[in-house]
Amino acid sequence: MDGGHGAADGEGVTDHARAVIVGGGVIGASVAYHLARLGWSDVQLLERRSLTCGTTWHAAGLVGRLRGSRTASRLVQYSAELYARLPEETGQATGWRRSGSLVVARTPERLIQLRRSVALGRAVGIDAHVIGAADVSRHWPLCRTDDLVGAMVIPDDGRVIPADVTQALAAGARAGGVRIRENVAVTAARVRDGAVTGVHTTEGAIACDVVVNCAGMWARALAQANGVTVPLWPVEHFYAVTRPIAGVTPDLSVLRDLDGCVYVREEVGGLLFGGFEPAAKPWMVEPIPEDFAFSLLKEDVEQFEVLMRGALERIPALESAEIQLLLNGPESFTPDGNFVLGEAPGLHGYFVAAGFNSGGIAGAGGAGRALAEWIVNGAATMDLTAYDPRRFLPRHAEPGFLAARMREAPGLHYATAWPNRESETGRGLLRSPLHERLAARGACFGSKMGWERVDWLAPRGVEPRTAYAFGRQNWFAHAAAEHRAARERAALFDQTSFGKLLLEGPDAGALLGRLAANDVAVSVGRTVYTPFLNERGGYESDLTVSRVGAESWFLVTGSAQRLRDADWIRRHITGGIRVALTDVTEAWATLGLMGPRARDVLARVSRAALDHDAFPFGAVRDIDVAGVGVRAIRLSYVGELGWELYVPSPRAGEVWDALVAGGDVTPAGYYALDSLRIEKGYRAWGRELTPDDTPLEAGLGFTVKLDKPEFVGRAALLAQRVRGVRRRLLLFALDDPEAVAWGDETIYRDGRVVGTLTSAGHGHTLGRPVAMGYVSCPPGAPPETLVRERYDIDVAGVRIAAAASLRAWHDPAGARMRA
């Protein structure tokens, strides 16, 4: 069927294209340019009004290279390089100016954040350094400095004229054969059998294989027409421009005072200043008017006051300056502050590039190239999981949730980047059936994929609220007690947020054999831990596969991978494959009973045979627990004897109560789970395992069976095995027991940068900080030689010596969990 959007295929079609891009802002122009560069000339870009008319035209044009992650920084690095060369290539100016950036710190905590950013910059090749407060005036003579503790300088940052960048990209796209049509609106994609076949427009239907939704503020509504989730919402966004001010020169760098919520740059001899208020103002309009083009919103002096105050505190000369413009232009933001980039789940050929959180100019070049490569190659060529549309549930796009979250999300761009920071708005989308019980026990909850999850539990008399810090946070001792309970006695984790899928049918085994790198052709009652790989040999997911029937498999994956894994499987159900895939996540609660006494605790409330011979490691059994039918899998993510108990959600409370009734079980949260798994060297999706990492690099070659029939990624791994890996995951233990690392710290080997930490925590069993991270190595070098080198970890500007290992620090032989 055609998805309910008009005529059948071929009927009413007035044009054809290989790809149609919807939206003529800087993002759409970048995608068009890069598709043309990759040889796709049969492309149309459709703009409902005129190029740049949505939000691009009023953007401030800042291009700051150093972002919050390695991937984001690399994307913007490319943008800066592109904008610098486009004028020569296309003959169209971009306004690129290498102005540099100066980021000032009012507090010691902010200075720690800047030092962490400098370390990240070194790892990705961005020049950045910290200066003292006394040196700030040399970079910015008009800047007040008496309340500063330091600053960060990024010499290669820059600025552009957004409309000019868009026109340059459009010129390059046209030169490559792209057809750009203005005053043509797209109303929906044409769909047949789960794939794009064209688009409906105000000028008729166009047949195409690919549609790219770059519709900016309108992207959510356009996506909804085809059942696609794009959770973004427009927010009123402000900046002011002054008339010329004495002492303001064109060579001033862009000044950012994150503690004051503002940025400042030169503008025709005056200053342009704006920022991100801690309490933003969503533009509460639905739908967004179709005729909103080159338009602005009403001035709101009261909302702008916090930015005005921050600017005055930093630039006293503004007190006597004349404001000639106060601009209020909407910008679209997403719930987690990352843009939406990639192919939509469940609809082949429907791509999205939207929700750039006021960073569209900086991100457009890199994002446009990354998405174009995805479209042309059929898969992403780099790790884009932080931006993948599959990270959101449909409920994340509901107006009530978005309106609440958008009051908070924009301000987090300039808020202190605390480790483990949790959003406070739009919470409670999904709750475990054990939520109230855990809340009564003092649980402090975090959020993952919409689920409320226990981070840590506060003892009686302690407020269950995290006090953020770059050092040890207030939960450290409480999570340590939970950690020790799992190592010494028994701990009980609520892991209900795990994604749970049921795959059934005559061809289920063959399909899994094609997708899984491990051998999943096991007998009924066995569980296998396996990667799902892409064609590059990188991780698409890691999960457990339990055979629960002759034609039935129970798949358990991480909380964030629920939609991702289901979509990955469905994409491979082709050619009459006889299977049924069902998401049963919310039907089952998950209890993780872990620790050396776990068998005794479970035996007290179950009649099942639990000894090692009857219930070995890796087995799955349907047993009774307190009279409730439970699916038990003997696995451990903490490195101790344990079971994952899958309980029908309505009866989860009965099982929980029975397990804790004896008083010998300690409820525990995810902070303890994380320190336990790092101490044991267990890799985590999104940290050690990403689409850019292979099992051979991750030290998980034992989870891959290269001698089994063909599976996705096998050829890439065979080739890598021959040529040798160029990077390898190592486990680290820091020498300083008081050091606090959080991940993303830079790794030095013999004084040279060789990688960054992927995970870090405190090994309470070892009494030392522990971490993991990839380091570069010569191809074919024996891994054992890597651990004999000298390593240091840059923790907020201080290098701390660390021991390296290929094996787990705790129970490297794995005997305890197999007891």
Residue ranges of predicted features:
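Flavin (FAD/FMN) cofactor-binding and adjacent substrate-gating region
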Residues: 82-85, 89, 97, 106-182, ...
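C-terminal catalytic lobe of FAD-dependent flavoproteins
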Residues: 162, 259, 268, 290, ...
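Flavin-dependent oxidoreductases
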Residues: 30, 70, 188-299, 306-318, ...
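Glycine-rich FAD pyrophosphate-binding loop
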Residues: 36-57
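Beta1/beta-strand and adjacent pyrophosphate-binding region of the FAD-binding site
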Residues: 12-27, 44
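Central beta-strand plus flanking loop segment that forms part of the substrate or channel wall
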Residues: 60-65, 101-103, 217, 226-250, ...
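Dinucleotide-binding Rossmann-like beta1-alpha1 core, especially the glycine-rich loop
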Residues: 61-139, 259-264, 268-270, 291, ...
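Glycine/proline-enriched, intrinsically flexible loops and inter-domain linkers
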Residues: 382, 389-819
